[in-house]
Amino acid sequence: MYSLLSHNTFGIDVYAERFQEYASVEELKTLIAQGALTTPFLHIGGGSNLLFVKDYEGLVLHSRIEGIEVTEEDERSVAVRVGAGVVWDDFVGYCVEHGWYGTENLSLIPGEVGASAVQNIGAYGVEVKDLITSVETVNIHGEERVYAVDECGYAYRDSIFKRPENKSVFVTYVCFRLSKEERYTLDYGTIRQELEKYPELTLPILRKVIIDIRESKLPDPKVMGNAGSFFMNPIVPREKLEALQQEFPRIPFYELNDGRVKIPAGWMIDQCGWKGKALGPAAVHDKQALVLVNRGGAKGSDVLALSDAVRASVRAKFGIDIHPEVNLVGK
């Protein structure tokens, strides 16, 4: 048995029957050819978007494919090919250092580049799908395929790579197109307010502001186990919002292009009185109600029980189902 304690940011002490890393497409293909994936398997990135509910009875695979390669460049933009095992925030830092615009609002999001393309990570008005041009993969038969971005089925925190039928499709590289021309996204959260503290706006300053905002709201997984936002913000028809506004006139919301609205799940959880509350060794964070934390010694089942209780409260008060953004393993 192999401990996965260092491979999940929730800090859940669970075990896998076997654990295997690979550092290249060739190594992955060799594992496949040797029959290593004939038993149950799970492919993970940085473990920052997982909750292990129990030990994993099978093989856990982890990519260590590295590298950031410029494949095309002109005066206006740059195309880069990035290994799935590159730490996401290291890639963001690299982009900012080189003056490439696009990733900066996604600073400090935990995890790795491969998982960013699977999950369609997003923050502060930016989603990674808007930067991706293609995703390179290998399937369980050892066959390589490149998915153009419009083949990836991207939606809010979703892609075709999350579907059960694509469980055996492994992301190996992600290709991005980034701008070399000044292009900022500032109208989200408290970004503009925080920028007033600085005499000018630059990429490094915006990255610092994003990091400061995140650190002020979100606990450090190295200190208190968590997986960032545990729940997705629900998207509802405008009619549902208007009905809720009768009872909750101050309910916050964000307009979407298709006429629907997104309601902050954290606000609803807070309205249900859960912020800062614990259920055994698991708790709702006292600064950001979207975040569930391991106060120490929690099992995955403890966090899941808290999640279920929070969801039931929101459903009872608002008539809305909120769903985990975190992937539940072993439920």
Curated annotation (Swiss-Prot):
Biological pathway: Cell wall biogenesis; peptidoglycan biosynthesis
UniProt key word Cell membrane: no
Annotated InterPro entries: FAD-bd_PCMH (IPR016166), FAD-bd_PCMH-like_sf (IPR036318), FAD-bd_PCMH_sub1 (IPR016167), FAD-bd_PCMH_sub2 (IPR016169), MurB (IPR003170), MurB_C (IPR011601), MurB_C_sf (IPR036635), Oxid_FAD_bind_N (IPR006094)
Gene3D superfamilies the record matches: 3.30.465.10, UDP-N-acetylenolpyruvoylglucosamine reductase, C-terminal domain (3.90.78.10), Uridine Diphospho-n-acetylenolpyruvylglucosamine Reductase, domain 2 (3.30.43.10)
Any Pfam family hit: MurB_C
EC number(s) on file: 1.3.1.98
EC top class named in words: oxidoreductase
Cellular compartment(s): Cytoplasm
Keywords, comma-separated and alphabetical: Cell cycle, Cell division, Cell shape, Cell wall biogenesis/degradation, Cytoplasm, FAD, Flavoprotein, NADP, Oxidoreductase, Peptidoglycan synthesis
Active-site residues per Swiss-Prot or TrEMBL entry: R157, S229, E325
Gene Ontology terms for molecular function: FAD binding; flavin adenine dinucleotide binding; UDP-N-acetylmuramate dehydrogenase activity
Keyword Flavoprotein in annotation: yes
UniProt record, GO biological process: cell division; cell wall organization; peptidoglycan biosynthetic process; regulation of cell shape
GO cellular component term, pick one: cytosol
Role of this protein: Cell wall formation.
Protein name: UDP-N-acetylenolpyruvoylglucosamine reductase
Organism: Bacteroides thetaiotaomicron (strain ATCC 29148 / DSM 2079 / JCM 5827 / CCUG 10774 / NCTC 10582 / VPI-5482 / E50)
